[in-house]
Amino acid sequence: MAQGDDNKQAIGQIIRQEQALIFPSLNENDAFSLGQRIRDIAVKDKLGIAIDISLWDRRLFFAATAGATADNTEWLRRKFNVVRRFHVSTYRLVLEQNREDRMFAPYKALDVADYALAGGGFPIRVSGAGVIGAVIVSGLPQREDHNLVVRAVAEHVGQDPVALALPAA
């Protein structure tokens, strides 16, 4: 299958993920539980990552595991800005934009210092409220960052993570 066809299928699956992974509500305790779930997976699998769960106005959870770097926290910030701007998964935008340089097209006027075209940011969509924040992971290849977030969010909201997972690249 051609790369473009693979991307189209993955984009379709990510859209299904975004439509299925709706939180009934989200508070500080929910964010801690979700963040801890991601951290537990990372520790078990020996993944060096940074994790951020934030609403638009404040951070609710942050953690880093062994192997994460200072750069990962900067990637978290830049991915958060992308979710805030577009209200969709950052990996979906990576596939839609199809740019090797991880920068948005110049006409978007988004400074690379503040916006990263990289997977791992996922919108927090609350039933009846819309997108209110983002869950972000940084430290793995971008598709793996995305898959880790989707797995944890799916488990958290009672969806089947296997049915929602992207196929291996």
UniProtKB/Swiss-Prot annotation:
Signal peptide span: none
Pfam families with a match to the protein in the record: HbpS-like
Family: Belongs to the UPF0303 family.
UniProt xrefs under HAMAP family: UPF0303
Protein name in the entry: UPF0303 protein BCAN_A1444
Organism: Brucella canis (strain ATCC 23365 / NCTC 10854 / RM-666)
